[in-house]
Amino acid sequence: MQDATFDQIFPTSQRCRSYLHWTPVDVAMRAVALLAPTRCRVLDVGAGVGKLCLIGAANTGATWVGVERDAEMVEIARRAADCMHVEHRTQFLHGDIRSIDWSTFDAFYLFNPFAEILAYGPADALTRRE
């Protein structure tokens, strides 16, 4: 499947981010094969709209958890999981990675999770947001 086809499940307002910020489908498929060859828990840091988690849940028996600080993206990811019928193998958390217990996961994925934060400048990137 091509990115443009997959991205149709997301709102038009978010699709413009795909080429720059979201994991391409071919990369996601390779990452899924490497991270979750068996039933395990995978954490996607800076999950955005959940593209990796959605692809992972659709193609493995693993549990995929995405953490994202943008509440709108978390809601979009949850709706996409429902649409794809993978909500039972995905969880999308609105929050900061510093509040996550990393010891409960078997694998981790970070694809460009800090690009948007760093674009605002170092001082703003270090400011804790609730």
State each model region's role.
Residues 117-130:
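C-terminal substrate-binding/active-site "lid" region of AdoMet-derived donor-dependent transferases
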Residues 63-68:
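Conserved SAM-binding motif I beta-strand of class I
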Residues 72-73:
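Conserved short alpha-helix immediately C-terminal to the canonical SAM/SAH-binding motif I
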Residues 1-37, 76-103:
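S-adenosyl-L-methionine
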Residues 39-48:
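Conserved class I S-adenosyl-L-methionine
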Residues 51-61:
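Conserved SAM-binding loop of SAM-dependent methyltransferases across substrates and taxa
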Residues 106-120:
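A short SAM/SAH-binding and catalytic strip from SAM-dependent methyltransferases
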